[in-house]
Design a protein with these regions (language model features):
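Short aromatic-enriched loop/helix-cap "lid" or pocket-rim segments at secondary-structure transitions
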Residues: 25-30, 81-82, 112-113, 167-168, ...
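Short, well-ordered alpha-helical microsegments
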Residues: 84, 108-110, 173, 194-198, ...
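Conserved, mostly hydrophobic/aromatic
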Residues: 18, 87, 147, 189, ...
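Active-site gating/metal-coordination segments in enzymes
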Residues: 66-67, 74-168, 206-209, 217, ...
Length: 335
């Protein structure tokens, strides 16, 4: 079913920039956090793809995910450098994974970030909610500057979903962008629940992107529905939206995320851009990032007819009028 989705769009596959691969002991704690009811969502969060690493990689490949992030993040000092070392090994044995890395506000952060970039890291993750830190911390100023200069994207969980942190919301990260306007930042989860404010940031800063992780799924729509009034803006920002899924830490089948996006009725060109072309441009031959491996098709493959990015056909109701079929939050055993 997943392969039928992207083949129907005339794509060579998917690029999912927001998946998680971590050392087994760390991932086990993440899974226990979600399944133990500590995520603050007031409902069950079963892990749909609780499988060994090799099986998770094989599943993404079977889905037709040609490139994927391998995001990981620390929750305390003296952890990021070790995570980066593990991530480098994962990237070496998983050529279709985007070599990912992370950081924490601590002495030496600039040094190990420079080392990771030099070793080939092409995507970073910052989790302001879990890390509980201020992104404007002076120990991170050189880190943000380095990422901006190298044009290496960083996925930032800066929205206040599923629960607010001391430094979530648009305010703190806006301070970083004001100081480093050339930073290539990807706002995780479309910035839920502050969708409009983070779309504003994308309008002000040309290198700010947003990923779709969990957005428009039945699960997130119950917690933080996307306002229908913002759909035209989402359509207009189509060249800045990237597919993300949160695989494997999702409580529904992978296909549900794709069907939720299709259910917005923003047109086939918008879906092609979001599900493949935007990330191929950002990380592939045209992105200046240096990861020149074949992506299985050019970025400009938008030949199928249908509405343009601005052809917003969503009518009435909230964006929570989710027309995606299947994939209820409890259907976690279906790929």
């Amino acid at each position: 079913m997943v392969t039928a989705f992207w083949r129907g769009l005339g794509l060579p596959g998917l690029v999912d920039i927001h998946t998680h691969f971590m050392p087994p002991n760390v991932l086990a704690k993440v899974w226990a956090f979600f399944e133990g009811g500590r995520a603050g969502v007031g409902r069950a969060w079963p892990i749909a793809y609780r499988r060994p690493e090799e099986e998770r990689v094989a599943l993404l490949r079977a889905f037709g995910v040609r490139r994927f992030g391998a995001l990981l993040y620390p929750h305390k000092p003296d952890m990021a450098a070790w995570l980066n070392s593990w991530a480098a090994g994962f990237a070496a044995r998983t050529p279709d994974a985007l070599h990912s890395a992370t950081f924490f506000p601590e002495p030496g952060a600039a040094g190990y970030v420079a080392e990771a970039i030099g070793a080939g890291a092409r995507l970073f993750k910052a989790h302001l909610q879990v890390g509980g830190y201020d992104p404007r911390d002076e120990m991170l100023d050189a880190v943000w500057g380095m990422l901006a200069e190298a044009r290496v994207p960083v996925v930032v969980h800066c929205g206040s979903g599923p629960y607010a942190g001391a430094f979530t919301g648009p305010g703190p990260i806006s301070g970083v962008l004001a100081r480093h306007p050339r930073l290539t930042m990807i706002v995780a989860h479309l910035g839920a629940p502050e969708y409009g404010e983070f779309l504003d940031l994308a309008g002000r800063y040309p290198r700010v992107h947003l990923d779709t992780t969990m957005a428009f799924t039945a699960f997130l729509e119950q917690l933080a529905p996307f306002p229908a009034a913002l759909l035209p803006r989402l359509a207009h920002a189509g060249d800045r939206i990237l597919l993300g899924s949160d695989f494997p830490n999702i409580p529904y089948p992978y296909l549900h995320q794709l069907e939720a996006l299709a259910g917005l009725d923003l047109g086939a060109p918008w879906l092609r851009a979001v599900c493949h072309d935007n990330a191929a441009r950002l990380f592939g031959r045209g992105g200046g990032v240096g990861n020149n491996r074949a992506w299985g098709g050019g970025v400009g493959t938008n030949r199928a007819p249908g509405g343009g990015v601005g052809n917003n056909r969503a009518r009435g109701g909230g964006a929570g009028n989710n027309r995606a079929r299947g994939g209820g939050a409890g259907a976690s055993s279906v790929p």
